[in-house]
Amino acid sequence: MPREDRATWKSNYFLKIIQLLDDYPKCFIVGADNVGSKQMQQIRMSLRGKAVVLMGKNTMMRKAIRGHLENNPALEKLLPHIRGNVGFVFTKEDLTEIRDMLLANKVPAAARAGAIAPCEVTVPAQNTGLGPEKTSFFQALGITTKISRGTIEILSDVQLIKTGDKVGASEATLLNMLNISPFSFGLVIQQVFDNGSIYNPEVLDITEETLHSRFLEGVRNVASVCLQIGYPTVASVPHSIINGYKRVLALSVETDYTFPLAEKVKAFLADPSAFVAAAPVAAAPAAAPAATTAAPAKVEAKEESEESDEDMGFGLFD
């Protein structure tokens, strides 16, 4: 089969991206740094039937989207985010599910000198199994060690690389010697496009529990402010009523004014001992049956003791 010329290939690519944008209401803009062809093939296979991955040159993707803005103006929101080594993952499924599938396809990778660290790298305290001749190597990196049974032992956890730092040759060599693959590479979600709206992927981590707690926190803040400024709202009125009742109750206690709910409080303040005495009286009837049941048991035990004594006497004098 003859290979299609470049003009035909471009035309087909434009048609494909436009068709995907029309057919799929949701997509991810993903970064593909350090993702090889073999890993990309594995990602496509794992997403088959659930999502479609489309990569390409940024200029071609922008041109295709700009040419389709008349039919779908919301696509213009994608343009500022098409920069760097990026692509699209189109889907009709739950976005969180597809996000989790992308994360599952990340693969561990060794540190390479000159690479930018995507995460912090910490070397744990351990016996390295390396011989004493490597001691100077650890000293050059500022790692405290000791010789234990003829091998180098790292005494405490060491933060070797910070996020965003360039990996040095010494750090890369050390991690390789310790067989540590600190990084993992895969498609990284940069933005989420959902039915014309675009937002940060962190929004996918918001659960119903998160929304509920944030809502309650907002209600508490509104109630607090409204109570301070004396402005009644649905959130503050219950607290205002309770506070008002407390003030009326305090006024009733200090004056001759009274009402039914205040009578019990006044009676308690007038004679607290009456309430204290009422508690043992209420507990006494419950304790009485236990005492009566214990008494017959004691009598039965005494009778059994007398019978055993009599038996002992007959046995001795027979």
Swiss-Prot record:
Glycyl lysine isopeptide (Lys-Gly) (interchain with G-Cter in SUMO1) cross-link: located at: 298
Q: Which residues carry this modification: Phosphothreonine?
A: 59
PTM text: Ubiquitinated at Lys-264 by RNF14 and RNF25 in response to ribosome collisions (ribosome stalling).
Cross-link Glycyl lysine isopeptide (Lys-Gly) (interchain with G-Cter in ubiquitin) mapped to chain: 264
Which cysteines share a disulfide bond? Answer: none
Q: Which UniProt keywords apply?
A: Cytoplasm, Isopeptide bond, Nucleus, Phosphoprotein, Ribonucleoprotein, Ribosomal protein, Ubl conjugation
Cross-link position per record: Glycyl lysine isopeptide (Lys-Gly) (interchain with G-Cter in SUMO2): 298
Location of Phosphoserine modifications: 305, 308
Tell me, what is one Gene Ontology molecular-function annotation carried by this entry? large ribosomal subunit rRNA binding
Q: What is its main location?
A: nucleus
Query: Where is the protein situated, by its record's location annotation?
Result: Nucleus; Cytoplasm
Residues annotated as region Disordered?
Answer: 293-318
Q: Which biological process annotations from GO are given for this protein?
A: cytoplasmic translation; ribosome biogenesis
Where Phosphotyrosine occurs, residue numbers?
Answer: 24
Biased composition annotated in UniProt, kind: Acidic residues = 303-312
Q: Name one GO cellular component term.
A: cytoplasm
Q: Which PANTHER family match?
A: 60S ACIDIC RIBOSOMAL PROTEIN P0, LARGE RIBOSOMAL SUBUNIT PROTEIN UL10
The subunit structure is: P0 forms a pentameric complex by interaction with dimers of P1 and P2. Identified in a IGF2BP1-dependent mRNP granule complex containing untranslated mRNAs. Interacts with APEX1. Interacts with FMR1.
Q: What does this protein do?
A: Ribosomal protein P0 is the functional equivalent of E.coli protein L10.
The family line of this record is: Belongs to the universal ribosomal protein uL10 family.
This protein is called what? Large ribosomal subunit protein uL10
Q: Which organism is it from?
A: Bos taurus
